[in-house]
Amino acid sequence: MVSIPEYYEGKNVLLTGATGFLGKVLLEKLLRSCPKVNSVYVLVRQKAGQTPQERVEEVLSGKLFDRLRDENPDFREKIIAINSELTQPKLALSEEDKEVIIESTNIIFHCAATVRFNENLRDAVQLNVIATRQLILLAQQMKNLEVFMHVSTAYAYCNRKHIDEVVYPPPVDPKKLIDSLEWMDDGLVNDITPKLIGDRPNTYIYTKALAEYVVQQEGAKLNVAIVRPSIVGASWKEPFPGWIDNFNGPSGLFIAAGKGILRTIRASNNALADLVPVDVVVNMSLAAAWYSGVNRPRNIMVYNCTTGSTNPFHWGEVEYHVISTFKRNPLEQAFRRPNVNLTSNHLLYHYWIAVSHKAPAFLYDIYLRMTGRSPRMMKTITRLHKAMVFLEYFTSNSWVWNTDNVNMLMNQLNPEDKKTFNIDVRQLHWAEYIENYCLGTKKYVLNEEMSGLPAARKHLNKLRNIRYGFNTILVILIWRIFIARSQMARNIWYFVVSLCYKFLSYFRASSTMRY
């Protein structure tokens, strides 16, 4: 069987979502590890006054492509930016571009999607379902297409506790939903959304389930593979450890925890944190397309790209390693010292929200006003709470994903491909990964230099001293207000102090005894 780089040699690849997190990494990996690929067509829309070519060039100029620039300086010649709007009829392709794509494309990687959990249902359906259907219809016209590779999500069927590598029946017929949305106004769509999505937590997951069914039904005559990643995080190894460029998913929570803004979150310590590194998702996508292209399986291939079944990691462990990392390598200008409480208790959660989030933010905004600056912390806390509401479903529940197809795929790789396109998450050391992840948010998202660590540590020590001073003042105030005015309270206080003194005296005496 040919190797993965050999399979991609001379191939023309069509990629959607190339300006997104996953798409960028896939583009870089494809060009670096399969250097003889003929060309990569990237569908990109105009945005903020930038042409598709300018947007692609901005992506290629980023740090993510540093390694590729060193190894293959001429890689840009293989990338062809094509103006396309996935939400428009026929993808808004010009006739000339459409003809080129139909004549040349061998492999499609469909990574584009709206990943916002609070997306309006109409918009989510438009990009995640209708755009996917239009791409399938375009693929059916391609004369040399070998594989249609669709990136979904492992949570598409999160209403099930055990999820196999199959496409399940959709919650509603996608065609009927699309037809209904055409005559509904936005108010009606918003009203019926909770009833439509049912036991799924958001429109993103709901529409990704519909998209899978569209791929299965509309692409029945195509050679289709689906990869379902769980919670996609920073890179594990490639192009370098810890690369991340956005606040999405856990990244924003990690940063908020490192800044000392996030102090509590509704989560179960024992719930599985099914994080999967972005380079594992990319490697699996490239390998899955290779397998389907070489073997031409009779049925659609689905791969649950998850870690919980083979290398379990829990949210309590995530919290421990995140806080430990940020205490050793603090973020600059932290609001408070990093410390997070995980709780699944409703009352306790809201207590900590009031005491550890809202009260400090309110007091800090008063301080900003008094010093002539614009208050901002309450707005930050409000945005943080909205993000937490969307994520608590995933931090409070666990799922079991079948990974038989993933194991089969891994066994099909030759020794060299197993190294180059590593998908074996059993080798993943979580403590090291989380440390690199946190450092990645510091370096690549916040653009903080590691040379600033001494100053950041000094600032963290200052916050510690402020905390000790505040607690001391609080104890004195409690003494003056309550204890000093009550004889019973004073007697209890003296008894406790006396008991502590006797214990310390006994401990001292015991420690100086020689045997």
From Swiss-Prot:
One of its GO terms (cellular component) is peroxisomal membrane. Residues 451-507 are annotated as: Necessary and sufficient for PEX19-mediated localization into peroxisome membrane. Residues 484-515 are peroxisomal. It is found in: Peroxisome membrane. Keywords: Lipid biosynthesis, Lipid metabolism, Membrane, NADP, Oxidoreductase, Peroxisome, Transmembrane, Transmembrane helix. The keyword DNA-binding does not apply. SUPFAM superfamilies: NAD(P)-binding Rossmann-fold domains. Its EC number is 1.2.1.84. It catalyses: a long-chain fatty acyl-CoA + 2 NADPH + 2 H(+) = a long-chain primary fatty alcohol + 2 NADP(+) + CoA; hexadecanoyl-CoA + 2 NADPH + 2 H(+) = hexadecan-1-ol + 2 NADP(+) + CoA; octadecanoyl-CoA + 2 NADPH + 2 H(+) = octadecan-1-ol + 2 NADP(+) + CoA; (9Z)-octadecenoyl-CoA + 2 NADPH + 2 H(+) = (9Z)-octadecen-1-ol + 2 NADP(+) + CoA. GO terms for molecular function: alcohol-forming long-chain fatty acyl-CoA reductase activity; alcohol-forming very long-chain fatty acyl-CoA reductase activity. The keyword Transmembrane helix applies. The chain crosses the membrane at residues 466-483. Pfam families: NAD_binding_4 (PF07993), Sterile (PF03015). InterPro entries: FAR, FAR_C, Far_NAD-bd, NAD(P)-bd_dom_sf. It is a single-pass membrane protein. Residues 1-465 are cytoplasmic. Catalyzes the reduction of saturated and unsaturated C16 or C18 fatty acyl-CoA to fatty alcohols. It plays an essential role in the production of ether lipids/plasmalogens which synthesis requires fatty alcohols. In parallel, it is also required for wax monoesters production since fatty alcohols also constitute a substrate for their synthesis. Belongs to the fatty acyl-CoA reductase family. Interacts with PEX19; PEX19 mediates the targeting of FAR1 to peroxisomes. This is Fatty acyl-CoA reductase 1. The gene is FAR1.
